[in-house]
Design a protein with these regions (language model features):
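Preference for protein termini
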Residues: 1-192, 216-219
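ATP-dependent carboxylate-amine ligase
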Residues: 1-78, 84, 392, 404-414, ...
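Short beta-strand segments
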Residues: 91, 195-197, 224, 261, ...
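Residue-level signal for inorganic ion chemistry
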Residues: 149, 223, 261, 283, ...
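Short polybasic amphipathic segments
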Residues: 162-166, 226-229, 365-372
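Walker A (P-loop) phosphate-binding motif
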Residues: 182-227
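Flexible active-site lid/hinge loop adjacent to a nucleotide/diphosphate
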Residues: 230-339, 344-348
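Adenine nucleotide phosphate-binding catalytic loops in nucleotide-utilizing enzymes
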Residues: 295-302, 306, 335-456
Length: 580
């Protein structure tokens, strides 16, 4: 049994069973995180009203007692109240992360027992159990190596059984229980790394930056919601916008430049994967996947996204959307972000230019960049295929963010410009992002947009394109609220559709019954003004796509919002139409 296997089952603390006081889970944060730059552990408790006020006092008090009993000195803690509960974070050395999670859980047990008037475990016995775990987890060799790496300015990747210092072509990886006494540090180094997060646009921005790296002749790679890729090789397909994808990418010995798409879930579950990035981008923040880990509002979500700044190395650049009020409000006061905007009169852009700080903006049809000393017109939006002639303003934002991040990675303007001029919305360069096809003289677009904000952005851009008739395919997974599903339909109506096909998503019911989601979508279409005969039904997305392709005629426009059957739909379009 490995050390980590033993630690995962080392202690079972019988938590009080009462719906008024629920520990929603404890987890280890392996890198910089929402609460701080150091790794640690966090627990989320669900409690309401006056009981929550008592938890705010009692839980950290019991944690302090346990830490004192364990002679755990100078441990930073963060108490974060939220609507309906409390989160408690404990910073911990890298060889006390399991112990930290158990200590938080034990402190909760003592707290809940006291508040519920129940018998608590004997403190000396509980401390003895925790000391045994701490002794078993202790790894002085790991701590010593981590200190030496930090002194040399080297980054660290950590999981349950392995530790890596440096990145990619400069990385070394060892089993945590088999560490060298005197490693050769001469070949260990970090490589340029960028992090990209946000509610929408992060995948496109990630792909753009990686393409810019390839354009200068280095082996660049990315981890994303679609795959992990090094050069032209896809290492794994799937949602890898978390620490596991980052580790898979950054441990590849061929890698010379890395771009990590970073999702909300990965940040909250395990923290950020790196601590020495040269650039971090936040594209925007909108309501999405709220209600988990105590993140209940879009303001909370903005704080999660902005925590990427804690993964920056000294001198790294934080690239932020100056047009997003949530991003602006959450921006760390300790930093001078590199702002980008579609409006040259945005006060943050005006201030940055006046102060001689780097920034990017859109003016007179061109993407403008400043390094603080020189301002250049990088490229005209009309020459950026992703912008759809300037109609897709969200992709102008993504292009500005990518260009500024690429500059932060040390890339010159020529390859940045070349990628923006050649990178297309097609299944090769940017699969699932407004991919354009021609079928029977109609323009057909495929997009994987999955929330009201992203759907509204796509449909608003396509609404500017002329069309005789407009078709939309709608479907979605069942793990959205009724309000969210209605919002998805409302966002799609920016396209002013003449026909909507509502498709069931049988593999993604996620707690709902067959027909629930299509019924909600159909009702919202009726409320927004479509007649019943303008709303068609399909039992799968691929069937719905085929129905639309059978109906389109020259001059029509169709948007297929695809959640499932992606490969089948792309194959269908390849057989019945052409790219472009």
């Amino acid at each position: 049994m490995t050390r980590s296997d033993w630690l995962k089952q080392a202690l079972v603390i019988p938590l009080p069973d009462d719906p008024a006081l629920v520990l929603d889970g404890c987890r280890r944060l392996l890198g910089p995180n929402l609460y701080g730059r150091e790794p640690g552990a966090v627990g989320d408790a669900l409690c309401e009203g006056a009981l929550r006020d008592r938890v705010l006092q009692a839980w950290p008090d019991y944690l302090a007692q346990l830490l004192a009993g364990l002679e755990w000195d100078a441990a930073a803690t963060v108490l974060r109240p939220f609507d309906g509960g409390v989160s408690l974070y404990l910073a911990a050395p890298i060889d006390r992360l399991f112990t930290g999670a158990y200590v938080i859980e034990a402190a909760w047990h003592l707290c809940a027992c006291a508040l519920l008037g129940r018998a608590a475990p004997d403190m000396p016995v509980l401390l003895a159990d925790l000391r045994a775990i701490m002794a078993h987890e202790a790894n002085p060799a790991l701590r010593a190596l981590a200190d030496k790496a930090e002194a040399r300015g080297l980054d660290r990747l950590l999981d349950d059984d392995w530790v890596t210092f440096g990145h990619g072509a400069g990385a070394v990886t060892w089993a945590i229980d088999d560490l060298p006494a005197q490693p050769d540090w001469t070949a260990v180094n970090d490589i340029p790394v960028a992090l990209v997060t946000g509610t929408n646009g992060k995948t496109t921005t990630t792909r753009l930056i990686a393409a810019m790296g390839r354009a200068v002749g280095v082996i660049s790679g990315l981890s994303s919601t679609e795959f992990v890729k090094v050069g032209d090789e896809v290492l794994e397909k799937g949602d890898y916008a978390g620490p596991a994808g980052a580790r898979l990418l950054l441990r590849d010995p061929r890698l010379e430049l890395a771009v990590l798409e970073v999702a909300r879930g990965g940040i909250l579950r395990r923290g950020l994967p790196v601590g020495h990035a040269q650039a971090a981008v936040v594209t925007n923040v909108a309501s999405d996947h709220l209600g988990q880990y105590g993140i209940n509002t879009v303001e909370d979500l903005a704080q999660v996204k902005l925590s990427v700044h804690r993964a920056l190395r000294l001198g790294g650049q934080l690239v932020l959307n100056a047009d997003d009020a949530l991003v602006v409000a959450a921006a760390p006061l300790s930093m001078q972000p590199v702002w980008f905007s579609l409006d040259p009169a945005n006060p943050l852009i005006v201030a940055a230019r006046a102060a001689g700080r780097a920034c990017g903006w859109y003016q007179g049809g061109s993407l403008m960049l400043s390094d603080g000393a020189t301002e250049v017109a990088l490229i005209a939006a009309a020459d950026v295929p992703l912008s759809l002639g300037g109609a897709a303003r969200y992709n102008i934002e993504n292009a500005l963010a990518a260009a500024l991040a690429a500059r932060a990675l040390g890339l010159e303007d020529a390859p940045i410009r070349a990628v923006l001029a050649s990178f297309r919305s097609d299944p090769a360069d940017n699969p699932g992002r407004a991919n354009a096809f021609s079928v029977n003289g109609a323009r057909v677009f495929v997009d994987f947009a999955h929330n009201p904000h992203s759907i509204a952005a796509v449909t608003s851009a396509l609404a500017a394109l002329p069309a005789k008739r407009r078709f939309v395919l709608l479907s979605h997974a069942g793990d959205r609220s009724d309000e969210d599903i209605r919002g998805l339909v409302s966002g799609a109506f920016a396209l002013r559709p003449d026909v909507v096909v509502v498709a069931e998503n049988p593999k993604y019911l996620r707690g709902r019954s067959l027909g629930d989601v299509p019924a909600l979508m159909r009702q919202r279409c009726l409320e927004l003004g479509l007649r019943a005969d303008q709303i068609l039904a399909a039992d799968r997305p691929a069937v719905g796509a085929e129905m639309i392709l059978d109906l389109v005629q020259p001059g029509d426009l169709a948007l297929l919002l695809v959640h499932d059957d992606r490969d089948q739909i792309f194959a269908m379009l390849g057989q019945r139409g052409t790219l472009g």
